[in-house]
């Protein structure tokens, strides 16, 4: 600063400052300027001090000498996840409480036995068998909502638990390279059997603290971008990708929406379809909506047995559709969220079996099953080329839905549209093409032949057939005269109708002689059809629409139907129901078209719409029609009868009514025939059962006679003395005695059977059945064996039971104790029952019945002898 005095007055630069504390040593500059102070030069010393707090020095995350072969193969300094040192506390689900009570009873019995020294092993074994049976029944018949609770079990193994159990090496990778690392999604490189994979999955917590840290496995956009980054990394280096799905859904808070939650999910969906490496998705818990799909667009979707995959949580669905959270069980049933339901819908590609009570009961075994499934799926996918992999992934999702989309197959449009421009000018009205005379004559000749075939020669006294023939000849002449333009006015359609009515009456009179083979109602219906085909409307000036079916085509269809009915009656078989239904549908279309034309011509379109609306409201409310509405309907029908084509409409309605009656009669006849057949079969079964009981009774009487009983006991004691369970250990003399005893029993039994009223035929053993059926029996055995193999390889339940049986046999070491033997027997019975239920095929049943039906025809058949107990052994 200059040594001369400086007066700080007036408007100086310091006046622009607004701070009241700016100045020299805390004195404002503005105050200094006003006071007119004179500043002298002096030495100024300025010192700046800062107090720094003591901070903890951060350690570098990478170890100076990492051990890649440490236990579990994980570089622990890259992951905060550690396996639990102690098993978690057991959590009892609501539906498991009955099992817990049984378990407490077993423990109480054991404590009592230890304290008192009383042997309660039998009671304990019985309770354990009962507990095991209840456990199997409970977990093999879980409802969808119960599987949801198992999938959400707090102790269920998480994604990183499986990584720790099934990988030789695993390095967790972090970050989305945009400044955030979402803990809800974990990912890393791992190796299985020497092959490197990129593993990505939702990570849930194992306690409340971990769940809060992991955000309950609900990812934010950062998590999906992190997953996409690592997928692209794996795609670049050629690592197959395995994703693990276990999330209730994407995190739906306001900030996630602002950061682009929907965009991140959509970006993942699009990018996953373009990955050039195999992709497998495994649902290990619950898969919720888009949060699961964002890492679930894979070539194969596998599901654990108790996992669920849904578009909306059952609780949310119940609240939306049924306005109550209590409707969650119904919603879970309707949503089809279980693994088995999704496998049937071809959404899931496979089911990985779980331990009996869920994956949380044996996490290590569960991880090994997942490992096996990954290896099998990867062996299949690695054989495909890159192009085939992408196509396979696309087709998997394209075929989803009710009908699915089949690629490369042209689809014919349901409604074709003519896009050609209409030519200028009014096209001439097309005239109705008349039915050819030859066709009408052929129709009448066929009808005449059908009626004459229905007569009996014994009814020639009345000779109604000749009267019908003359009536038809007269009808033919009238029709040919009517076709002549000069005589058309002389022969109106009413005369033709009168002759047809007369013809109908003559036939009905002839029908009373009970000589007609063809049902009268059918012939009458055919005459009505012919009448409508021949009758030409007097109003020939009306224009014919392009979509109208010509009368000749209707006549041909009715002729085909009549021929089918007549041939079906002559051959004692039913007429083709397809032709009848087709004719009815054709007539319905014609009636609807004529009705639409009549409504349009009478100007009743708006009235019809109004009436339909009022009738629909009345039906919806289950209320009768009001008198006013009935009057309006009656007025509508009267006005409709004035339409130009009303007579055509009435004729076609009558024809439709008659054909429908024929169909009803045929259906009724079919039902009656079916009822008679069922009754006959029932009577046969009852008679067979009665005879079987009678034969058993007679056999018991024969065996209970003192002489036979004494010989039987003597032979039995000799066989026991020889100590031979098969015939190879018996001497010739003893064999001879047994044969003689069998002959004596057969003779006594034959005498007893004759007293029942049955005939006995002597047939050598083994010759009572048809040798030609041997190939059929072998084929049936092969089919049954094939079905059993398919079920054993495809059913998760059967697989699990077989694995448990193998494990139980291995534990026993070939010498099972009573407890182990009971468990083995229980598992064997369960496997047999499951196989029997799964192989319950109608085709196999039919083959078996065809083979076994002749077995009861002769008494000496080996199977019948075994059935009534003749072939007893002496062991």
From Swiss-Prot:
* GO CC terms in record: acetyl-CoA carboxylase complex; chloroplast inner membrane
Q: Where is the protein found, in the record's own terms?
A: Plastid, Chloroplast inner membrane
Please state the pathway this protein functions in, per its UniProt record: Lipid metabolism; malonyl-CoA biosynthesis; malonyl-CoA from acetyl-CoA: step 1/1
Q: Which GO terms describe its molecular function?
A: acetyl-CoA carboxylase activity; ATP binding; carboxyl- or carbamoyltransferase activity
**Where would one find coiled-coil regions in this protein?**
664-705
Q: Which UniProt keywords apply?
A: ATP-binding, Chloroplast, Coiled coil, Disulfide bond, Fatty acid biosynthesis, Fatty acid metabolism, Lipid biosynthesis, Lipid metabolism, Membrane, Nucleotide-binding, Plastid, Plastid inner membrane, Transferase, Transit peptide
Q: Does the keyword DNA-binding apply?
A: no
Q: What is its EC number?
A: 2.1.3.15
Briefly describe activity regulation.
Answer: Activated by reductants such as dithiothreitol (DTT), and by thioredoxin in vivo, following exposure to light.
Q: Give one GO biological process term.
A: fatty acid biosynthetic process
Q: Where is the transit peptide?
A: 1-50
Q: What is the effect of changing residue 317 to A?
A: Loss of redox control, also 20% loss of carboxyltransferase activity in E.coli
Q: List the membrane topology term(s).
A: Peripheral membrane protein
The record ties this protein, via HAMAP family, to: AcetylCoA_CT_alpha (MF_00823)
- Please explain the role this protein plays, according to its UniProt record: Component of the acetyl coenzyme A carboxylase (ACC) complex. First, biotin carboxylase catalyzes the carboxylation of biotin on its carrier protein (BCCP) and then the CO(2) group is transferred by the carboxyltransferase to acetyl-CoA to form malonyl-CoA.
What family does the Swiss-Prot or TrEMBL record give for this protein?
Belongs to the AccA family.
Q: Indicate the quaternary assembly.
A: Acetyl-CoA carboxylase is a heterohexamer composed of biotin carboxyl carrier protein, biotin carboxylase and two subunits each of ACCase subunit alpha and ACCase plastid-coded subunit beta (accD).
Q: Under what name is this protein listed?
A: Acetyl-coenzyme A carboxylase carboxyl transferase subunit alpha, chloroplastic
User: What species does this protein belong to?
Assistant: Pisum sativum
Q: Taxonomy-wise, where does this protein's organism fall, top ranks first?
A: Eukaryota, Viridiplantae, Streptophyta, Embryophyta, Tracheophyta
UniProt gene name: ACCA
